[in-house]
């Protein structure tokens, strides 16, 4: 019996959660009106190439069940396939830090306790309490917290975003002063000033993860027409909402006063008190809502990305103990290792960066460069597919035959290289005496991370460790649309009696 196909709107709804990245608005705001240019650049020349190339790879006969691990393994070999899935997982160990910084910024306002956002030691302790609390809450199974994640998305992300957009619109319509220049020269960045371009990496981060939804193209009605249309609609929505959100922050908060972890709360405070000085309590309510929403997002990331590493363990590429799950189908050893790594990153970034904007910027840049290495492998794998494996059957093709495919993938590949290198240039928004710290933390962390999966792959004896269970890919019906696509993971965790942890 043929499975019911999903409609254009249904497919769009599966991916739409990625367009609301409220905790990135302050970083977008540091680019002032350049944010529109960067959103267009990233959306049209990076997001769309990734989405289209991923869709073609997802429909290749025999590749439909494996995601990026399978795509890269089939084109570049198992070693690089493991590296790709490793980078896709490892980036979130840094990403947790930026999300929790944002939560701490909101809570510091609610509790009127600024040290929670500025004192490195207190900030680190707060990070540990939130992260480990949310991690342990997930050990009972993700089904228990699915409703919490949905509620967090609506209450803590969607509603505050609507309120922010409404307040900002009223502020602008009222003819109130705007903190950034608005003229025809303000839209396009000065390419001779490299330090002003580095913020582009945060815009790339906003678009990352779409390949996780590309796999569902096999369930989509008329994919040749509907998939590109869904992605174009998604880009338009992302550009519109992120431009409004970033501009709202930039317009009301002076650049010198902008906190990257608490900038959204600063914006709510400025706008609400502008209209009514007696509504300070409302700012705290909204800050609490946002903290709740981002906590829900953090909890959704705890298990999802580790599913890819669990699939690698099932294929015998990691030690046997990493195949273990508890009775709730949570890969506890992997999640605990993830937690230890997050703790180490939290210490490095919080104490190394002083717990201020520098820590936040390094964390964002490091997240992006780790993820980008995985995307470079993805694009190289795609080139191998279209030039050396062109005879493989597939149900979707990137438009333009081989020439069009090369141009589209080439643009995405080159922009990935540009974003990777530009990440190591200190941003214009940090003080000159902090530039060396920024570069050293980022460079050392990146080099260690880049070689780590290859060391792990070589050191583990893979002989005799046969695949114990072929990974089973999520269907659209299994997906919680309130969860960011990359946070869902792509595979079911198959519980085997002999691999259940004993109490």
UniProtKB/Swiss-Prot annotation:
Which ranges of the sequence are coiled-coil? none
GO cellular component terms, alphabetically, are: plasma membrane
Location in the cell reads: Cell membrane
Q: Where does this protein hold L-glutamate?
A: 33-43
Tell me where on the tree of life, at the top rank, the source sits: Bacteria
> What keywords appear on the UniProt entry?
Amino-acid transport, Antiport, Cell membrane, Membrane, Transmembrane, Transmembrane helix, Transport
**Could you give a single Gene Ontology term from the biological process aspect?**
amino acid transport
Give me the reactions it catalyses: 4-aminobutanoate(in) + L-glutamate(out) = 4-aminobutanoate(out) + L-glutamate(in)
Membrane-protein topology: Multi-pass membrane protein
Per its UniProt record, what InterPro entries does this chain match?
AA/rel_permease1, APC_superfamily, Glu_antiport
Q: Membrane-crossing residues?
A: 35-55, 153-173, 194-214, 232-252, 366-386, 407-427, 440-460
PANTHER family annotated for this entry?
Answer: AMINO ACID TRANSPORTER-RELATED (PTHR42770), GLUTAMATE_GAMMA-AMINOBUTYRATE ANTIPORTER-RELATED (PTHR42770:SF15)
Cited function? Involved in glutaminase-dependent acid resistance. Exchanges extracellular glutamate (Glu) for intracellular gamma-aminobutyric acid (GABA) under acidic conditions.
Family the UniProt entry places it in: Belongs to the amino acid-polyamine-organocation (APC) superfamily. Glutamate:GABA antiporter (GGA) (TC 2.A.3.7) family.
Protein name, please? Glutamate/gamma-aminobutyrate antiporter
Q: Gene symbol?
A: gadC
